[in-house]
Structure formats: structure tokens, C-alpha cells
């Protein structure tokens, strides 16, 4: 079976500074895959490598087996990859509906049926479709950002720390939204600092340290891994607390 997304020995960084040192990972159909690691591990950089936001010095990025290494972001979007960055991921002065319409900018068909599906997936947005997106709660703004990306019916959705800065209540809501999106059949690659909650919903996970692969396993196995617990989860088995 061909992986939806594959990074194979990817190296690269910003300017003269190399951050990724030969990392490899895969996302299979219908999976949620989580990348965790300490600050500076290269988690977000790995995601930007997929989306064409930095020049790679080595390795390959493949979508459905086809090479997309070092392609421009607009090319990557048209091929079915949508990326929700951690910040500045909505148009705050536009309404919720206008944000979703912006998400459909590369579609050349009638996007209204898809918008109806997005409102069904995110009921709070349907209630506030005319409201300026910047006036919503942090959790609802993240829903707008994800809904905007989902307007393109992507082959894979990339989420960079979707719960960053949110209260525990809103974090829980966003993880539920991630599961709901995945339940529609959309594979998800997610970078997340809230390792325990992320691994609880993940099919598989990758631990990056200093721009290199450290551990990869199922979400459940990583939760029970003592090394992972010591590094990111406060010591002891993650699922014991």
C-alpha cells in the first residue's frame, strides 16, 4: 500500500542553519500521526518541509508515491496538501463564512455543498457564520482555520500545534475536532506539545530530538514508553497519571 505522505531522509533548515538531519516518517490512509519532541527538535520544520516552506538539502517528500520535494506551496496545495500553521491562520477581519470561502480559492467548481459539510462538521461555526472570525474564542478560531483548510477536501491535513495557547477545555474540544475530521477519512499529520492528549488520539507517533528520529511507534506504545514519559510527560508511564 502506498503511503499518503512520506518523508525519506529529509535534511534542511533556514539560511545556513540545518535543523533536520535525515528524518523519515510516513502517514498511511486514514491515520492520525503525531510528531512530538522538545523545543528545537525540528517538529514544525518537518511540517514546513512538506509544504515547501524551506529548501531541502537532501531526502525526498512524496505524496501518494509522487515526488513533491521542494515544490512551491501553491503547487503542494493544488496536489492535495493543506497546512494549518500555529499562528496567523485565519483572516480576523473577515466573517467565518468569508474565511471558508477564502479556503476554496483554488477550486473551480461549486464549493457550496462542501461548505454545508464543513458547517455540519463544525456546528459552532454555523451559528456564527456572519461574525468576524477574530472575535471568536481561541478554540473556535482554530475551528475556522481547520474548516478553511478542509474546504479543499485535502488528501492530507497538516496541523502545527493546533492547541497552542488554549485552555484545557478548548484543548479537549480541538482534539475532538481532530478526531471528527479524521473520521471523515482525512489523514492527519499533527505537531503537538500536549503529548499525552495527542498520543491518546494518534494511530502512530514520531519522537524527534535534535532534528533526528529518536523513537516511532503506535500512540498507545509511546504513551507507555518510559523514555517518552521521562522526556515529555513528567516521568513514569504517561497513562498512569
Each model region followed by its residue ranges:
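Glycine-rich phosphate-binding loops of nucleotide-dependent enzymes
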Residues: 2-241
